[in-house]
């Protein structure tokens, strides 16, 4: 009878530790792009909704990821990621 191979992959850190590190990185990035009062309000809303639970941690991670993604996609001034605005030719011609 065949047996599954022994796990020979790299040692992984515990999920909880990885999740908290991800949250910390997202918070540091969010502070660079959004007013602290907005982030504080978001944190308060999550805390009031979920309390001090892992579900709350996951909710704030999702929210910060979505906010940062949209922020970069719209065109953050600090990022090369995002929608590039086409400059119109000075002679008034259009490429449409």
From Swiss-Prot:
Keyword Cell inner membrane tagged: no
Localization per record: Virion; Host nucleus; Host extracellular space
Keyword annotations: Activator, AIDS, Apoptosis, Cell cycle, Host G2/M cell cycle arrest by virus, Host nucleus, Host-virus interaction, Ion channel, Ion transport, Modulation of host cell cycle by virus, Phosphoprotein, Transcription, Transcription regulation, Transport, Viral penetration into host nucleus, Virion, Virus entry into host cell
Gene Ontology CC: host cell; host cell nucleus; host extracellular space; virion component
Region annotation Homooligomerization: where it falls in the sequence: 1-42
Post-translational modification summary for this protein: Phosphorylated on several residues by host. These phosphorylations regulate VPR activity for the nuclear import of the HIV-1 pre-integration complex.
PTM-bearing positions, type Phosphoserine: 79, 94, 96
Assembly description: Homooligomer, may form homodimer. Interacts with p6-gag region of the Pr55 Gag precursor protein through a (Leu-X-X)4 motif near the C-terminus of the P6gag protein. Interacts with host UNG. May interact with host RAD23A/HHR23A. Interacts with host VPRBP/DCAF1, leading to hijack the CUL4A-RBX1-DDB1-DCAF1/VPRBP complex, mediating ubiquitination of host proteins such as TERT and ZGPAT and arrest of the cell cycle in G2 phase.
Homology family: Belongs to the HIV-1 VPR protein family.
Record HAMAP family: HIV_VPR
Protein name, as recorded: Protein Vpr
Gene giving rise to this polypeptide: vpr
């Amino acid at each position: 009878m065949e047996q599954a191979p022994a796990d020979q992959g790299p040692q992984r850190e515990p999920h909880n530790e990885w999740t908290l590190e991800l949250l910390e990185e997202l918070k540091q990035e969010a502070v660079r792009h959004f007013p602290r009062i907005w982030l504080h309000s978001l944190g308060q809303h999550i805390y009031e909704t979920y309390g001090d639970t892992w579900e709350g941690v996951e909710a704030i991670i999702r929210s910060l990821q979505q906010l940062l993604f949209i922020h970069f996609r719209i065109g953050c001034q600090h990022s090369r990621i995002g929608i590039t605005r086409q400059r119109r030719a000075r002679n008034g011609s259009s490429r449409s």
